[in-house]
């Protein structure tokens, strides 16, 4: 109980410090902050898994950081986090050195994100189904469905 409270307080403080420039430039402060994010993520806190997963994916040092970031994003997406599911879809569609782009897997993650209320995921699904992709045939009905869902979630195209 006390350790969980300490973890929550440390995470809260680290999230507040994240918005200041100085702690991010200090190696010891940054290491402490990452420790707080990792601790809360390990305790199963979905927002911490999503936040730290994004940090590791985009700012992590080395190949292991990227893989850990994807693992945390996967856990967060399975816990219902729409941003994490959206980012996993983006990563699946982009592919990397070890795997080909996978449009069907991207569609699965974006469907989860859209169900969680992520408007851009619904819009990207509409585009994906409108154009089709390797392994995912074009489907105008699905495209229209997700375009309507994106609008209902608040997506407004530029222009």
Predicted regions and their residues:
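Canonical positions in the second alpha-helix
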Residues: 38-40, 74-76, 111-113, 150
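TPR/TPR-like (Sel1-like) alpha-helical repeat modules
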Residues: 108-113, 123, 127-130, 137-155
